[in-house]
Amino acid sequence: MTMVASWTRNHILDLTDWRGEELDIVLQTATTFQQVLSGQTKKVPALQGQVVTNLFFEPSTRTRSSFELAAKRLSADVMNFSPGTSSLTKGETILDTAKTYLAMGSDIFVIRHQQAGVPHFIASQMDRLQTGVKVLNAGDGQHEHPSQGLLDLFTICSQFAPDNPAIQCLQGKKIAVVGDILHSRVARSNLWSLTTAGADVHLAGPPTLLPKEFQQLTLAPGSGKLHCHWQLQPALEGADIVMTLRLQKERMTAHLLPSLREYHHYFGITHDRLKVCQPGVKVLHPGPVNRGVEISSELMDDPDISLIQDQVTSGVAIRMALLYLLGTVQE
């Protein structure tokens, strides 16, 4: 592949200030890698000789596996960090851990941490030390999860424009995002990427899980609109896409929800509830899924409506694109 001359970001930390052109670069690059993955070779030497280090301070299965596979498909060498068996248990700081992997020759850090801001901190320190190391945020606390936001964007655009996924296909589309907005870094990344792409995003959830701060967000000029609903029906009416989010019980304090059964009664997504959406509506979920809570099992397994497995497939191509763009950006 040739260098993407118009790509200038040294780190991918959030999606708050991305331009539409940058989103399209990622989508175009991911489309190329999707074609590679569907072919016989499945591997390219784009990052041969570079080292990608996965610094996951928080448990992860699908994101870590997806990044590891993406790096290997680009022919990069991969190192994986596990906090339970690391020197963190002996008092080592996060920065010293990063410096240790830096000394081993890391070129790209993929960082997940339960505390918001850690990837930004490591990126700032790598820049201060003039290391040339790139940082990719794989999810930090309740802040953002940019690669998930981009893979969701790619999955959705691939539905509306399968031959050439680009953000223009989302102009004026209505996308409902339903569930635990309060604790969701996925929701935050998605609302930035989708509105920048021109879609109108409708957030829906119980008042305890949909804070008023989202109503006060300032979007870039020309972006789609953002709406908040404490009832499900207005968000679903006329929706082209419905994204449901996991209830993050591990992050919740008491009394945010009466019960999981009551949540499903008011906000669970089912075939019946989708009748008010646009014909051909599709459903996404970033996973892992609580079946029968956020979404019914029947709907989740419906190949005509559910794009959940498509999201997993898109994830590898998008992460290949992001690693490639960071690994080939000119300083």
UniProtKB/Swiss-Prot annotation:
The enzyme's E.C. designation: 2.1.3.2
Residue positions binding L-aspartate: 90, 185, 246
Residue intervals passing through the bilayer: none
Keywords assigned by UniProt, alphabetized: Pyrimidine biosynthesis, Transferase
GO-annotated molecular function: amino acid binding; aspartate carbamoyltransferase activity
Pathway: Pyrimidine metabolism; UMP biosynthesis via de novo pathway; (S)-dihydroorotate from bicarbonate: step 2/3
Binding positions (carbamoyl phosphate): 62-63, 112, 145, 148, 287-288
SUPFAM superfamilies registered for this protein in UniProt: Aspartate/ornithine carbamoyltransferase
Enzyme class, broadest EC rank: transferase
Catalytic activity: carbamoyl phosphate + L-aspartate = N-carbamoyl-L-aspartate + phosphate + H(+)
InterPro entries found in the cross-reference section: Asp/Orn_carbamoyltranf_P-bd (IPR006132), Asp/Orn_carbamoylTrfase (IPR006130), Asp/Orn_carbamoylTrfase_sf (IPR036901), Asp_carbamoyltransf (IPR002082), Asp_carbamoyltransf_Asp/Orn-bd (IPR006131)
GO terms of biological process kind: 'de novo' pyrimidine nucleobase biosynthetic process; 'de novo' UMP biosynthetic process; amino acid metabolic process
PROSITE patterns linked to this entry: CARBAMOYLTRANSFERASE
Subunit structure: Heterododecamer (2C3:3R2) of six catalytic PyrB chains organized as two trimers (C3), and six regulatory PyrI chains organized as three dimers (R2).
Family, similarity comment: Belongs to the aspartate/ornithine carbamoyltransferase superfamily. ATCase family.
Protein function: Catalyzes the condensation of carbamoyl phosphate and aspartate to form carbamoyl aspartate and inorganic phosphate, the committed step in the de novo pyrimidine nucleotide biosynthesis pathway.
Protein name as catalogued: Aspartate carbamoyltransferase catalytic subunit
Species of origin: Synechocystis sp. (strain ATCC 27184 / PCC 6803 / Kazusa)
Lineage, opening ranks: Bacteria, Bacillati, Cyanobacteriota, Cyanophyceae, Synechococcales
Gene that encodes the chain: pyrB
